[in-house]
Amino acid sequence: LSGLVGTAIHYSGAFLSYPAVTFMDALMARFVLNGLTGLLVGFLVLGGIIVGFNLTVILNGWAILNALGMMFALALGIGVLNCYLFTRFPLWQRAWAILMRPMFILSGIFFIPENVPSRYIDAFMINPLPHLTSEMRRGVYATYDAVHVNSLYVYGIALGCMMLGMILLLRNHKELAEL
């Protein structure tokens, strides 16, 4: 989602030529459309598994909502910052794609953070993605206790990236539209 938001100005160049359309319109349209699409797909997959296999589950709705909130906030924050960086420095988009490959492995999808050795856990949890996956696990698995989740940390990173990206975009959006 952050990658799609990051390319909003590039792909909305024709719309940005209209005086009534701003870069914020392009960012928010891209975020809302792709965010709701991803949410619907996730709901259908999870719901389909539960109904298809006739599972009895105890879902923690607050933990799921918190995980989704962290995910959307982080995607928007990093997406807004990358929107500036991708447009201003085209090479950054390729570098970002290369850097994010190992981040997928280190996001806590294939293993749980509680199994990481104690001497590495602090370094591992610098990455905000394990916080998301652990919080979602807490919402789906009733017996899972997400000890290392720090929601404020994730929301803080998201807000910081969003603020920095907005400052850069507000200062340079006319220049970026010409690139």
Outline where the language-model segments fall:
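Short cytosolic juxtamembrane segments of multi-pass membrane proteins
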Residues: 170-179
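Short cytoplasmic-facing helical segments at TM-TM junctions of multi-pass membrane proteins
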Residues: 14-16, 62, 179
